[in-house]
Amino acid sequence: GQGPTEIAVIGSIAWNEKEHDLYVTDNGQRKILRYNLDSLLNDSLYAPTVKLKFGNVPFPDDYYYINDTLSYGSFVETSISSFKQTSGKWNMITGEAELIDYVHPADKKKRVAFAVSPRYNTLVECNRRFDLISLYNLDGELQCNVYGPNWDKNGDGKEHFVDAAICGDKIVVSYTGEDWNHNDGARILHVFNITGDYLKTLDIGRRINDLCYDEENKRIIMNLDDEYQFAYLDLEKYISN
């Protein structure tokens, strides 16, 4: 079995900017480990501490940390007969979650990638099963739905959006558009402004496993399923123009 600081099944990773802490979710042991980045880089014997044990209460499979009482994340709601993924607020201390109730009428099994921007009071849900993006304010109130050219209210058996990031005043999402069960993964990025207007598409040409926004250097960092595992795009050069 795993030791007290070993990770059984790694989950999401969140960043506490103020404390320079990484919060690493261990789905296997149902806890969050705290790694102080400064100590981790300077102490070869450094071991993480346990930030939170969450037992059987709902917890986000991905989240954006603001403080111990407020994070925004995506949650998987499961029951014997259903599976639904939705976004919402999360209090890490109490375990309380305020989830978005809205589900598009065409969507019976909601699967989403989420991104949030406190600066622009915007939360984005990008649908994995439909060519659909839903924009909310931070209170979870629907602002608009954005339908892409491959929208089909009956579903088309394809995987659509995979990951999302809000980069300044732009929404950047990775997109597949191929068979749900047999595809080569997301290889393109769609770019929208913060209100959901389409701006452009970028063909990366390599499978994008994950992406995030480096605000300090104004660039998108990508993890690729390729010989080159990491790459970045300059926001001003490729996205803003």
Regions found by a protein language model. Give the residues of each.
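Eukaryotic scaffold repeat domains enriched in small/polar residues
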Residues: 1-241
